[in-house]
Amino acid sequence: MKVLWAALLVTFLAGCQAKVEQVVETEPEPELHQQAEWQSGQRWELALGHFWDYLRWVQTLSEQVQEELLSSQVTQELTALMDETMKELKAYKSELEEQLTPVAEETRARLSKELQAAQARLGADMEDVRGRLVQYRGEVQAMLGQSTEELRARLASHLRKLRKRLLRDADDLQKRLAVYQAGAREGAERGVSAIRERLGPLVEQGRVRAATVGSLAGQPLQERAQAWGERLRARMEEMGSRTRDRLDEVKEQVAEVRAKLEEQAQQIRLQAEAFQARLKSWFEPLVEDMQRQWAGLVEKVQAAMGTSAAPVPSDNH
């Protein structure tokens, strides 16, 4: 189960670039053809074969499911896969060294040194892949809510180079192991027979194990993808329900504010009318008094003008 999980987690890296690579021109990947040439049935080689199969499957997943993979658990599972792969590779190397006793010590030391270097390169490639995933997850979280198209394109370019380098180093490691086996044949026929007797059951066991993993891997992964899809749909529905509830609350608050504003406007109108009536009660007596005074003044002026206009009596009479 750990190998299955780890294979899915590693292959997700290429799945992140599926959307970007659909836009650019499709180019043939020669590494897939090389893969078929060097696979000979060893356990670590079969694991790499499943890696490429899962790679194509993960590319069919939706972006939502791919984003679900961007979690700390993914990094932990990927680290577990790397440790398990290197452990099996070291165990296989130890078995070969035990069976190569007829080979000269100098030849064994040289072959062992070359094999360790190839093994270290393969481990560094896997660590680089894990580091790219961690870096990508951090950048995606930092760019939350923004466009990640440029980030996906850059990651796609890095992952393509890493896939080629990983396959190249795995091919080199397979060749080193082949040299080990050739050295056993050159050493003694007895050693070769012992190696074949030991490796035969291991190869068959690896093939059976790979077939079992391949038959059981598809269904759990599909069920997990469906479960993720259902979780995403449930989250979307929950967010929609919360949004609707929030809109209803906002509408109620707006209605309350409107009612308060109308009430305050009515109060202001009443206060204005009361103030107007008060002003009228203050100034009406003054206006009436001024009107009376003005009328009296007009009457006096008219009376004065009438008196001055009367004729003066003549002295002749």
UniProtKB/Swiss-Prot annotation:
It is found in: Secreted; Secreted, Extracellular space; Secreted, Extracellular space, Extracellular matrix; Extracellular vesicle. It comes from the Eukaryota. InterPro entries: ApoA_E, Apolipoprotein_A1/A4/E. GO terms for molecular function: amyloid-beta binding; antioxidant activity; cholesterol transfer activity; enzyme binding; heparan sulfate proteoglycan binding; heparin binding; identical protein binding; lipoprotein particle binding. Residues 1-18 form the signal peptide. Disulfide bonds: none annotated. Residues 266-317 are annotated as: Homooligomerization. Pfam families: Apolipoprotein. GO terms for cellular component: chylomicron; chylomicron remnant; endoplasmic reticulum; extracellular exosome; extracellular matrix; extracellular space; extracellular vesicle; glutamatergic synapse. APOE exists as multiple glycosylated and sialylated glycoforms within cells and in plasma. The extent of glycosylation and sialylation are tissue and context specific. Its main location: secreted. The modification Phosphoserine is found at residue 147. GO terms for biological process: acylglycerol homeostasis; AMPA glutamate receptor clustering; amyloid precursor protein metabolic process; artery morphogenesis; cellular response to lipoprotein particle stimulus; cholesterol catabolic process; cholesterol efflux; cholesterol homeostasis. Residues 210-290 are annotated as: Lipid-binding and lipoprotein association. Sequence repeats lie at residues 80-101, 102-123, 124-145, 146-167, 168-189, 190-211, 212-233, 234-255. Residues 278-290 are annotated as: Specificity for association with VLDL. Residues 158-168 are annotated as: LDL and other lipoprotein receptors binding. The modification Methionine sulfoxide is found at residue 143. Homotetramer. May interact with ABCA1; functionally associated with ABCA1 in the biogenesis of HDLs. May interact with APP/A4 amyloid-beta peptide; the interaction is extremely stable in vitro but its physiological significance is unclear. May interact with MAPT. May interact with MAP2. In the cerebrospinal fluid, interacts with secreted SORL1. Interacts with PMEL; this allows the loading of PMEL luminal fragment on ILVs to induce fibril nucleation. Belongs to the apolipoprotein A1/A4/E family. This is Apolipoprotein E. It comes from Pan troglodytes.
